[in-house]
Amino acid sequence: MVFCGLFSELIKGHSSSNNNGTNVSLAKTIQTNIRSQYSSDLSSYASACKKYSSLKSFDSLLHERTNSIISSLAAQAKTRSLNIESLMEVYGYLLELNQDTVRVIIESKEDVLKNNDLKALVDVYFKSTSKTLDFCNTVEKCVKKAEISQLIIRFAVKQFETETVDTDLGESKKKKYVKTLEEMNKFKAMGDPFDGEFVTQYKSVYDEQVLLLDELRKLKVKLGKKLRNIKTWRILSNVVFATAFVTVFVLSVVAAAMMAPPVLSAVASGLTTPIEVVGMWCNKMWKEYEKAVKRQRGLVLTMELGVQANNVTMVNIKFEVENLSIRISSILKTVNFAVDREENEMATRFAMQEIKKKVEGFTEKIEEVGERAANCSKLIALGRLVVLGHILGLHIVEGGAANIISSV
């Protein structure tokens, strides 16, 4: 869905610098006018929720899940910056919404098969999920690079242990750890596999997904009069709209919170007020978000300027909180320490002992991120296959539907 496609680059954009020192302008990305642009669509959605019990149930579940993710992120923001675990939690939320939409499309099977206009709506689903798959592929490529880095540093540790017990110093004592240092230089040359392309694409993809939301609105206007009395059209179009709209909201909140964490607390506090009118909770959330962003706008822009002025080192940048990159950065620093003091045996021994402590956590995090990316890619691909099968009337993928739904 649009929502998964949006998040697919958020994790790429949480860092503010790439290899060339350029910055992703998150402050310019933050959306504050979406609610006013889609006010009529929100009213239409609220009316449809009152009319159709299935849509009302969907709205209740969407509301509950959105409350949960915003509250969870707000709690995290009180004690620390948002990190990769936070972003993966958001990704899980968006993935659940994707599966909910798959269910709705499957339930609308017969009508979609008979109606070319409804197929156009489903096209929006395929456009957005293709972005999600691209993201998963990017993550998996970075994980493979990280795995190579891990093998190199593990070999360096093994080499160090061998050279430590080697009493045959040969020509000079300073050459005792020469092979260890060679391997560490290789690791250093690999750099951070999660830097570069991985952290620079958020802005462009975010804009593209907002345009996709606008495309959806135009499609609704075009077909709305023609299909206004068709129950399936009203339910399906409102499900797609609501999930797309809420996704833009959640990702806008996260983008703002990376600059100014108080935005999350302000939005979360607004969720505690009961909302009487079904379907209008998302409108209220946007209001709270807009007020919070206006209050924090100066801080957001100030912090962005601070990032631009202080991107000399990753560890001093507020947004470089992704745990795997931090582990890699930590190991790289220790490698630099050893390499810069290659003639000092004690320095090398100290550095290698530190690396041995850090490499286990590095390995575990690589595996975790790789498994997450592979699983998400599989679920999204299967969801696309299930939807396509239902549109074409191919029942060979019925088993896949059960699998994807049970995976949520």
UniProtKB/Swiss-Prot annotation:
It comes from the Eukaryota. InterPro entries: DUF677. It is found in: Membrane. The keyword Transmembrane helix applies. The chain crosses the membrane at residues 239-259, 262-282. Belongs to the UPF0496 family. This is UPF0496 protein At5g66670. It comes from Arabidopsis thaliana (Mouse-ear cress).
